[in-house]
Regions:
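N-terminal leader/targeting and accessory segments in enzymes
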Residues: 1-95
Length: 95
C-alpha cells in the first residue's frame, strides 16, 4: 500500500532519531513538515538546528497549535500514546 504525501501537511511529534528521519523522508517526498518536541535538551537542540538548516519547520520546548494544522501525524516511538495532544488530534480526525 502506498500513500502519496506530496503537498500534505505532516506533523511529527518527537525530535529524536526517528523523528528526524521521518521529517527528512517526508520532506524529500514533497510534504510540508512540522516537527514538535516538548523536551528541550542537547539532542533536540542539535536536531532542531539540523532540520531548520534544511528548511524543515520545528519547535522545541512546547507544542503550539500549529501541530493541529495537519493532514497526518507521525508519532515517534518514545512518545506516550495517551497524552492530551494525541487525543485532541484524534478528535480532529488527524490521521
Amino acid at each position: 500500500m502506498s500513500f502519496n504525501i506530496a503537498n500534505k501537511k505532516i506533523t511529527i511529534i518527537g525530535l529524536q532519531k526517528s523523528g528526524v528521519a521521518a521529517a527528512q523522508l517526508a520532506s524529500m517526498n514533497g510534504a510540508h513538515v512540522f516537527v514538535s518536541d516538548l523536551i528541550e535538551n542537547e539532542i533536540t537542540k542539535k536536531n532542531y538546528q539540523e532540520l531548520t538548516k534544511n528548511n524543515i519547520n520545528c519547535e522545541i520546548g512546547k507544542h503550539t497549535d500549529q501541530i493541529f494544522e495537519s493532514d497526518l501525524w507521525v508519532i515517534s516511538p518514545g512518545v506516550p500514546k495517551n497524552i492530551k495532544i494525541i487525543k485532541k488530534a484524534e478528535s480532529l480526525d488527524i490521521q
